[in-house]
């Protein structure tokens, strides 16, 4: 990064920075981050904050020998969230707003658009959005699971220029620096593949739920949307000075030269498939043809229940995941079409309503 030319950024702050001793919020490291936010805003940069730490912040409000069951963690999150927001708010002389999200909010397209509109409106009026996963109410099927991936989804939804993930390490190393003295910090990653994930190892924070692997997953989500992604050390004051000077103090993951379109990115990285269709071997040729669509005679089977507009998985007969797509038909109607693809009624219905899957509503998945 040669110069600071951000228009809008997302900052992800982990639990270890919020509550380093797991005993409530501490301002030791947060003050420096708050100052960085103030300075960014002074330069005309819009900031969105994704802040972990509600469980760690609320833990001290309960007896120290309390077993951390799932229900107790939810209670700690509920109590700690108010404490954490109050801590952030006291550092600023401008308003902030709390948004608590679940994966269900993000994977539902209508709610996803609502989140975008809310964030844009807050930014337009100079309000700092502070976002966290709603750990107090979320269930396993609605969890993002970590705020690294949540921050990438938020960055994509907000059309951010950069995602800054503040960690307890300087960036991505070629091997674990805690085990290898000769580990080398990698300042720039041009593309993410299996070799990059192999460098992540399996380390996780003692306070939070994420590790280097989830940060790379977040970088993959963000860079595919054209968002530069940084993994940097949030415990060092010099990190923020160098960022404001236009330097790279950690590891930068470069964005795709040709980012995914918004709808394709949402289907690929955020939406959960509600069902699936099995297609025959003509799938690739159909997409390469003039119409770029999938018709009923190419559907071999339909699994699950889904409605028009739901995201579905497209797979081959051997189980290969080929694509995600928006369903133009309900599962019930699509099953009828698949079973009666040669019927005159089926053909007329597709001529009237459209193909089973159209090119503009499909996101191809990489074949492994």
UniProtKB/Swiss-Prot annotation:
Gene designation per UniProt: proB1
Source superkingdom: Bacteria
GO biological process: L-proline biosynthetic process
Protein localization: Cytoplasm
Binding locations of ATP: 12, 167-168, 209-215
Keyword Amino-acid biosynthesis: yes
Catalytic activity: L-glutamate + ATP = L-glutamyl 5-phosphate + ADP
InterPro entries cross-referenced by the UniProt entry: AceGlu_kinase-like_sf, Asp/Glu/Uridylate_kinase, G5K_ProB, Glu/AcGlu_kinase, Glu_5kinase, Glu_5kinase/COase_Synthase, Glutamate_5-kinase_CS, PUA-like_sf
Enzyme Commission number(s): 2.7.2.11
Keywords noted in UniProt: Amino-acid biosynthesis, ATP-binding, Cytoplasm, Kinase, Nucleotide-binding, Proline biosynthesis, Transferase
Molecular function GO terms recorded: ATP binding; glutamate 5-kinase activity; RNA binding
PANTHER family per the UniProt record, alphabetical: GLUTAMATE 5-KINASE, ISOPENTENYL PHOSPHATE KINASE
Cellular component GO terms, alphabetical: cytosol
Record-annotated PUA domain positions: 274-348
Pfam families assigned to the protein according to its UniProt record, in alphabetical order: AA_kinase
Function in brief: Catalyzes the transfer of a phosphate group to glutamate to form L-glutamate 5-phosphate.
Principal location: cytoplasm
Protein name according to UniProt: Glutamate 5-kinase 1
NCBIfam families: proB
Organism the protein comes from: Pseudoalteromonas translucida (strain TAC 125)
Family, similarity comment: Belongs to the glutamate 5-kinase family.
Annotated signal sequence range: none
Keyword Plastid: no
């Amino acid at each position: 990064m040669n110069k600071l030319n951000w228009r809008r950024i997302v900052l992800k702050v982990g639990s270890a920075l919020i509550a380093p001793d797991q005993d409530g919020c501490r301002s030791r490291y947060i003050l420096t981050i708050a100052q960085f936010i103030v300075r960014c805003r002074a330069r005309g940069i819009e900031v969105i904050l994704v802040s972990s730490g509600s469980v760690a912040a609320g833990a001290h409000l309960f007896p120290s020998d309390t077993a951390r069951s799932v229900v107790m963690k939810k209670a700690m999150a509920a109590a700690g969230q108010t404490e954490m927001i109050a801590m952030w708010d006291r550092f600023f002389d401008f308003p902030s707003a709390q948004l608590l999200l679940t994966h269900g909010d993000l994977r539902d397209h209508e709610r996803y658009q609502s989140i975008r509109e809310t964030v844009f409106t807050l930014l337009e009026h100079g309000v700092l959005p502070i976002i966290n996963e709603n750990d107090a109410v979320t269930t396993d099927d609605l969890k993002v699971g970590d705020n690294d991936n949540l921050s990438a989804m938020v960055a994509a939804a907000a059309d951010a220029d950069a995602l800054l993930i503040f960690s307890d390490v300087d960036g991505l190393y070629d091997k674990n620096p805690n085990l290898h003295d000769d580990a080398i910090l990698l300042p720039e990653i041009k593309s993410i593949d299996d070799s990059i994930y192999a460098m992540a190892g399996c380390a996780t924070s003692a306070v939070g739920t994420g590790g280097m692997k989830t940060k790379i997953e977040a970088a993959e989500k963000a860079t595919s949307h054209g968002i530069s992604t940084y993994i940097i050390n949030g415990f060092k004051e010099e990190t923020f000075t160098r960022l404001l000077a236009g330097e790279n103090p950690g590891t930068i993951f470069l964005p795709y030269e040709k980012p995914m379109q918004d709808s394709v990115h949402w289907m690929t990285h955020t939406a959960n498939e509600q069902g699936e269709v099995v297609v025959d071997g003509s799938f690739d040729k159909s997409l390469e043809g003039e119409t770029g669509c999938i018709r009923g005679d190419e559907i071999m089977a339909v699994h699950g229940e889904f409605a028009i507009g739901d995201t579905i998985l497209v797979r081959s007969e051997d189980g290969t995941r080929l694509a995600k797509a928006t369903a133009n038909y309900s599962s019930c109607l699509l099953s009828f079409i698949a079973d009666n693809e040669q019927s005159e009624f089926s053909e007329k219905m597709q001529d009237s309503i459209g193909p089973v899957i159209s090119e503009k509503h499909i996101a191809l998945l990489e074949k492994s």
